[in-house]
């Protein structure tokens, strides 16, 4: 990865999110300077997202969300004051690893949803529930990733701008419900997954049907002008799209380099995405690589959500990539947080790339290190691990769990913490190269074995 070693990366600094959040910008640049003084390799990503062509809109959305966040705090304070016992329990439970949601937290959140709905979607068009109901699910990233290509609708249902996709689900349509996972119908495997997690059959059926109904609404829901502005220009959306672009760029460069250096066919290479969600990012990488070279590696898509994997299969078929994916629906972590043993998935195969860039920010430090060690065991010599984390010093950090209301809780970390956790997992500092996205929201770590 010689491209990271140039002198330019020693001196460059960032104006993250165009320098709008001055405090975050200063803290991130200080972090980067300090790490480089310790001979850590840190690169700043380029501003390639189309949103950067409209800096005034980025500034406007930043200010708009700051105002909304302040108003939401006042609403929340009032709710907590009236429900002190409920709030205290919710605050304790949300700090416990792998507790995704709880009744008390949901009660408070339901009060706030009315405000979020009006503020994010538009006060005259309060129908963002189809998207908000998918929070915590990888399906929401379909909306964010494809924001530039979504049609936008006005108050009376008229089309303000016609995009490639008519609804907030982007490339995903109702064909997803026809997918089978491991030969079983989607509904059946969703029910079985819940039963395996201790839910009784009647409740499992009810929850699966409710989830499918919610996804169906999501697939049919339009995008309003206000919501479009937010998902195109807010820091979090920029960060997600930049993370995808960074990961895919690293992956494509690595596979091409290995093909040339080792005289191997890219078709024979193996990539794994651990916690892949809908697989949209990985499928985009496959499509781009195949368009450029005529070849693409086999990708193992590993996730515990059957519906997300069904979405991945459906998207792969649309892009004629179904013969390049291998889907595994497995529980990723035990109840105590131990990562899935990859031997059952990989057997004696070795990986050219192990990627989990959207997962680590949900993991406690101990589980983070266990996952690193488990993935390293199955990487080829000269293989590449790609991971990442949301930055603690990122711009507009309170938006994610505030106005957006994202669940579960994200563990934002400093860039230095990322380096330390990887080093404590047995990776030499010299093997780690970090890219901080231009928005300052994420850091992507590339580790070559």
Which residue stretches match the model-derived regions?
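A short His-aromatic
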Residues: 361-363
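Class I (Rossmann-like) S-adenosyl-L-methionine-dependent methyltransferase catalytic domain
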Residues: 4-97, 108-109, 140-144, 212, ...
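Conserved class I S-adenosyl-L-methionine
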Residues: 265-279
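A conserved beta-strand element that flanks and buttresses the S-adenosyl-L-methionine
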Residues: 355
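Class I SAM-dependent methyltransferase Rossmann-like catalytic core
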Residues: 120, 124-186, 193-200, 205-264
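A short glycine-rich, Lys/Arg-flanked "PGG" loop and its adjoining helix->strand segment in the class I
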Residues: 369-381
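Short amphipathic alpha-helix with an adjacent loop that forms part of the alpha/beta core around
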Residues: 336-348
